[in-house]
Amino acid sequence: MAELEKLAAARLEKEASNNTVNPVREVSEDDVKDVSGETTVVTTSISEGANESLSKKEDEPALIGSNVPEELEGNSLEVQSAITTDLEKVSSTPTPSNAEKESPEATEVRIVEEGKLEKADPSVVNEELSKEILEDPEVVPSPAKMYTALKAVDGDMPVLKSENGNDGDTDANTADEDNENDEDDVDEDEDEDDADMDTAKALAELAMTAGKSGNPAFSGTKPSMGAAGPSLPSLPQRPAVRKPIAATASDSPGRNTQRPNGALSTQITSTTDESASSDAAEGDETREKLQNIRVKFLRLAHRLGQSPQNVVVAQVLYRLGLAESLRGGSAPNRSGAFSFDRANALAEEQEAANQEEELDFACTILVLGKTGVGKSSTINSIFDERKSVTSAFKPSTNKVQEVIGTVHGIKVRVIDTPGLLPSVADQQHNERIMGQVKKYIKKASPDIVLYFDRLDMQSRDFGDLPLLRTITDLFGAAVWFNAIVVLTHASSAPPDGPNGVPLSYEMFVAQRSHVVQQTIRQAAGDMRLMNPVSLVENHPACRTNRTGQRVLPNGQIWKPQLLLLCFASKILAEANSLLKLQETTAPGRPFGQRSRVPPLPFLLSSLLQSRAQLKLPDEQAGESDESDDDEEEEDSDADDYDELPPFRPLSKEELEDLTKEQREDYMEELADRERMFQKKQYREEIRRRKEAKKRQAQMSKEELAEAEEAEDEAGNAAAVPVPMPDMALPPSFDSDNPTHRYRYLETANQWLVRPVLETHGWDHDAGYDGFNVEKMFVVKEKIPASVSGQVTKDKKEAQVNFEAAASLRHGEGKVTLTGFDVQTIGKDLAYTVRAETRFNNFKRNKTTAGVTATYLNDTIAAGVKLEDRVLIGKRVKLVVNGGVLTGKGDKAYGGSLEATLRGKEYPLSRTLSTLGLSVMDWHGDLAIGGNLQSQFMVGKTMMVGRANLNNRGSGQVSIRASSSEQLQMVLIGIVPILRSLINCRFGFGGQSQQ
């Protein structure tokens, strides 16, 4: 072996002196395989810079034969002969030209058992090496594979040592591998899209490094194993000498440039992600914080004596991982696969180093329950000392108090409350106590709520439902979303079952738990709730284990289990706040109450409705909502009625003497004169109204007061209460008609109170389920205002509607309408403040702008609207409006278009046609609807037709006819009756029943 070393050294010196291109070949002890015959890969590089690398390695000791095992010495000659033959072939090759120098290639040579040489395929080599690591049945999968998502070779990463303490190869092997890594980096820059090939290369390099580490525990490319589990192989380091910045900037990616000395320059790519965005950095920070939460929870479980395989621990860890993936979409190959192992290892390491250290964790617990169930005794059992006074004969806790202590180095803060009474007559007492609790917890919201009850209570009904509903009404339904049911006296003997045999303990606990959980669901109004149940036994005679911990009949140690449930809830709340999966709890709102998004489409529809402006009492006579428009369209034609010739009405006897044609002509003439007379009266009313406005504008306040006094002195007749007509009640099975009970009078009082009739009510019911109150008044003789309210209550629900409005005129053609509304939406009251201003742009154009704000369930929804009304001629009116409403980060957009075509003699003829189109966009869901309505006279019959259709394909068509002469129209009602009889006889569709 010494002679072989001398020959190899002499040949290398000769090649260096001749300055020729020779392959650099260094063989380590791992290049020689054992008798198992496994394939070994030897990489040989051809480079013009070989002289420099050789000159640096002349002083290094030879590796061949230095640590060769005895059983391999016989095969060394064969291996050395093959290497020498290959070197001679390479040295005999002519010197490459400049063109060939610009595109050098690395030749990989495989030495097989027989000593022959063959060219190796890089993809096959990488595949075999990766399979050798991952598929070996004796090797436990190592976390090293997780590094493939990152850059495999990084100069900033520390070299991980193998189990025997070796740093990897010698400096010669490290330099050789650095050249190979540089060439690999150039290839990666040339083809960045081939991510799979890069990952395979990184894995192969890690495997080759592990094989060259000299670890006797594995042959070739297997990572080291030890008592602590698999360890990562040593990562190859980057070369110490880097390419100058100027040279790096001048070289284009994927193209080789020639240095002045003729050596080939290699493009070196940075392995650190310098162009990482702020989102990625924030995601890494979030994952790190979440990992700290995992470590904290595992430390909590370890201190409570619970293993990671505990059901509660495993479920919490699973939820943390699921929440992380949903929030950030983190790749499982980066943190998901081994985050638990790392967290568990860190938790065990920190606990081993600091067992007595107090954790940076505190939990606040609120206890609620009936008196005498054992709340204070449980608090004493948790802290293993007397923190609260207890008594077996009377309530011992008289006020809300706070108990603070440490359990296994964990700070626990318990809010002890007085006991509640289950009787319905004691609800006032319970409300007073819970009012104190609600005031106390405003300072610091509790993390978990423990509701106490006894396991040995033999009640299978909902006797505690009034008490639980009182808790729900005061704290909200969200108090049960983060509550744990605690059943005390858990060592009680199970009662006898229906067959006289005692129930099993599991069945006893399940039945009692089901009753309490079902009662909570009824009180919260959510049948999906599933509160966890924990059993507690505080009696001194309770069975204990060797460590003195109290054990239940089912073998469970109740104290760690109860604390683990409390801590798990706090941990999940911290993770939820970190990942922002749900909206955070607002200050002063305990138990994580979440405000609901208001019904924006409903509120937007109410905002877009056109509202009539209020007017003074002397302006309201004979006016309608469209009176302002009618005032501006006074007909300029002469009054045709005064120019008509005299007309004498005929008596009944004279009509009978006329023929049919004469009678028809007479009726037409009479109808025309009646129509023209009504038109004359309508014009006179408009003219009188305009004159009154002008006169009122010219008169001063004193003159108005004198005019009112003169009217009072004129001796107007006093208003006499007049009974209002009875309302038409629906048919009833009752013998007597109860209308006499609800008669009311129309008095001179400004307050108008009327009953509200529900025509579609219950049988054997009067039909009156509410009342309505209205009042119109004037503020400071200029501002008309109105107040109206309605309250309805039936057997299921109650509704309240209140509206207050006032109009303020501030200039010619400018009116502002303000209002305050209260209405019932679901089970909540919505308070709305609105204001809109209408002004005249032109003679036939009016524009309205309005704002609104609605307060509903601790949420404010605000919106704006814009409306424009245009008159085209005397018959066509266009109304266009649009608005937007926002609340709780949500928005709804809407608008409508309405075109109205009036008859020639409207409003006398009552001929009117309306075409409407509405659009609303909410959450990207576009709703489009159209409706058409037309009413006209056919002789003396009023015909009304309606049709509507939306973009979802649903619509409705209705036709209504009303006449006082065509009584035969009543026969149409026979059609549905006949259809029902036919269906009952022959079945639906006319088919006979089988």
UniProtKB/Swiss-Prot annotation:
Q: Where is this region: Disordered?
A: 14-61, 84-124, 152-287, 616-659, 691-716
Q: Please give the residue ranges the record annotates as the region G4.
A: 488-491
InterPro entries reported in the protein's UniProt record:
G_AIG1 (IPR006703), GIMA/IAN/Toc (IPR045058), P-loop_NTPase (IPR027417), TOC159_MAD (IPR024283), Toc86_159 (IPR005690)
Q: Name one GO biological process term.
A: protein targeting to chloroplast
Task: Please report which protein family the annotation says this sequence is part of.
Answer: Belongs to the TRAFAC class TrmE-Era-EngA-EngB-Septin-like GTPase superfamily. AIG1/Toc34/Toc159-like paraseptin GTPase family. TOC159 subfamily.
Q: Where in the cell is it found?
A: Plastid, Chloroplast outer membrane
* Region G1, annotated ranges: 369-376
Which region ranges are annotated with the description G2? 395-399
- In this chain, composition skew of type Acidic residues spans 166-197, 620-643, 705-714
Starting at the broadest rank, the lineage of the source organism is: Eukaryota, Viridiplantae, Streptophyta, Embryophyta, Bryophyta
Q: Where is the composition biased (Low complexity)?
A: 269-280
Q: Please identify the protein, giving its name as recorded.
A: Translocase of chloroplast 108, chloroplastic
What the entry lists under NCBIfam families is as follows: 3a0901s04IAP86
Polar residues bias located where? 37-53, 84-98, 249-268
Q: Which residues cross the membrane?
A: 969-989
Q: Where are the residues of the annotated region G3? A: 416-419
Q: Name one GO cellular component term.
A: chloroplast outer membrane
